[in-house]
Each structure stands twice: as structure tokens, then as C-alpha cells.
Amino acid sequence: LPVLYLVDCSGLFLPEQSTTFRGHRGAGHIFKMNSLLSDEGVPQIAGVFGDCIAGGGYMPIISDKVYMTEQAYMVIAGAALIKGAKSQKMPSHGIGGPDVHVGISGCADFRVPDDTHCIAAMRREMASLPSSAVPYYRYGLDAAPPRFSPSELAGIVPADHRVAYEAREVIARLVDDSLFWEVLPEIGKEVITGVARISGLYV
């Protein structure tokens, strides 16, 4: 079964974690379980809804898909700690908001406007997953021809390799039903990354 995390954690006073977490391992047990689930191939989907400071930021980063609201931020050291240590005033969102983690670091995959949209996006993510890992690559849809004819590729890709062209137009003529789910479009814009199907198989 997939695991969903709804994350909104402002951290805690470390000497008191023995009274906050069960067992003698503290928060480390949570991160260990994150790693073990990942090793077993269990999908982990995280929604970041607010402040995620220190340990609160580890869990989303370990997850397979991470959604951040515009109000959320993930940091190891918050603005107050930076101000105390380096006498620098920096806004928390400037350190670890969606502009940083979706647009630069890649620690989050998608940004959404608010909590309602975040939960809806996580529901859609869940709905796209199969009931078990075995049928994953053929789950849900049969093979389908592209909506745009592959014969049009000759008019899209120029003979001169120095001439730029729109790669998404090429993808639309190769994948099933011309459906392509682009991932991390704000990072490394010279490369297009995403998920689609070819002959019914996820690629």
C-alpha cells in the first residue's frame, strides 16, 4: 500500500525528543522506516502544508513525490537560526519555499496554491497507482495511437541539427494518446523529463 504524509512540522527542542517520540531512537526511527519503505518499493507521497524545519524536512525529501503549497517551506535551519548564527535576515520562503525546492533544488516535484489543491493533487496521484506492483507497467490503459500523426515528425524535426525545434511536439507524436506528464519543468530547462506510455507501457 502507498504511504501518504501530510507534513506540517515546525521542529522541536532536541533534548526533549525522548518525550515526543516513542522508543529510544527518537525521530531516527521514522527516517529509518522511510528508507526501508523506499527500498521495498512502497510508493511514498508527501504533501508539505506549512513549516517543515530540521527533521520535519527530511521525510518529504525521502518521498517519491512531493507537493508543496505556496505557503510551505522546508529548511534544515530556519530564518531565526540563521539570524542568530550569521546575523543575516532572510525570509523563510527565500531559504526553502517552493521557488527554491521546485525551481532549484529539486527536493519537491510540484507546487500547488493551497491545502485544498494539495490534497486533490495527492488524491489524483493515488488514483494513478495500481493495486499492486505487479501490473504497474500495464495498469489502467491499453495501447493507444498518438492523437497527432507520427508522419508529421518530418515537418517538425529540421534537417539542420543547428536549428531548434519544440521537443514536446515530437513527444506528442510518439506517445500513447499524445498524453505526457511533465515533471520538474522549472529545473534544467534544456532537458524535458516526464512520464508517458508507449504501446501501453509506462516510460
What positions do the PLM features span?
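Glutamate identity and glutamate-enriched acidic tracts
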Residues: 16, 40, 70, 125, ...
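Short amphipathic alpha-helical patches
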Residues: 19-20, 82-83, 125-126, 145-153, ...
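Short low-complexity stretches enriched in small and charged residues
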Residues: 2, 21-25, 67-68, 157-166
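Terminal amphipathic helices with adjacent charged low-complexity linkers/tails
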Residues: 110-171
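Conserved catalytic cores of soluble enzyme domains
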Residues: 7-134
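Short glycine-rich loop/turn motifs
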Residues: 2, 31-34, 42-43, 189-194, ...
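Non-catalytic terminal/interface segments that mediate subunit docking, oligomerization
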Residues: 162-203
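A structural preference for short, pocket-lining loop segments at secondary-structure junctions
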Residues: 1-15, 196-203
